[in-house]
Amino acid sequence: MKIKLAHLIMLLGLAMLPLSCRFSGFTTMGNPGPKLSKATVFAPDFLKALYKTELTLYGRTITGIIVIKKVANGYQMAMVSEVGLKYFEFFFPEGSPFNAQAKYVMAVLDREPLKEALINCFGLLFREANYNSQTRLKINESETKVLLIDREKGSRFSYYYHPISGEVGQLIQNRFFGTRTSIKLSNYKNDAPGSILVYRGKISMNLQRL
């Protein structure tokens, strides 16, 4: 029993190592003040963007165009093939993007675990970071990158972003009992990122703005 307990303690210690190292180079911010911008993926004046897309699902790859459009109460997203065949269409309500509505999903993709994974990946793009008493804010030594950490419904969210522009460079969702989602964003063009790379288990996406 003692051997098993010692082994368990060792495993827990190893599991905590990535957590302690992940934030190396960042120190806790004091009073951020009004100059600190909020983490932003799609700017408030964003209206519409098209992305050339390569989507790999459990070893199978589909390609096409993803259209993201800002509507009255959220965001509309659809993916179509190069010949106009629709793969899926989702509506992500503002304020609760993980409660997205599947407007259409092609039969071959219409599987609950897959739909849930797609909604989670895309929903993370539209989620607004929380700024409250539970939020942790850190900044790197050169003061060029802020790390915001908040928690919601069994998940921890990490936003790495520029303190002045608010442009998010990386988004991470760690679910306490689930799959980790990581999104890298770059090449911002005024109102939205030019490049979006998504990694979630056996699902990956490469979106390049047109």
Predicted regions and their residues:
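Post-signal peptide N-terminal segment of mature Sec-exported envelope proteins
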Residues: 30-52, 143
